[in-house]
Amino acid sequence: HVVYIIKENRTYDQVLGDMPQGNGDTSLVEFGREVTPNHHRLAEDFLLMDNFNCSGILSATGHQWTDEAYVTDYLEKSFGGFTRSYPYNGDDALAYASSGFIWDNVLRHGLTFRDYGEFVKTTVKPEGSEWMDIYNDLQNGTHNVSISAKGSIEQLTPYVCPTYPAFTLRI
């Protein structure tokens, strides 16, 4: 199995700079082992990648680099205004590279995958449910709140975990 985890908007040094196995700057650690024990455990048990650079300078281009290894000319030129959309989550087909996504390559090679959040839209019902509503529903076992997910690109939907919430600050 390959597990591909995307950690956005944090530098290596901010999160894993306190790991002696890596080439980090401990003076830049903001979210060290005490705050991110799961990240540290994954790095210790599997793989620690330091000195790894990403060309994305914001979510819109970062997700394209992460998912396609390429940013289209259209996206680069839209950077200043995003008049059609902000395509960080698959909302603008003009931003897609003709070479396809990482999951297209997986499928071309006869392999399988499961998506837990990338290019996924989450629906929480009842609409307007906030974090405490969701938490209390879970704790009380009342099942009044439902969380569902589907691909923001339709071809991705069969591979999305339908109950795993993508990025949302409500949960």
Feature roles, as predicted:
Residues H1-I171:
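N-terminal pro-sequences and low-complexity stem/linker regions of secreted or lumenal proteins
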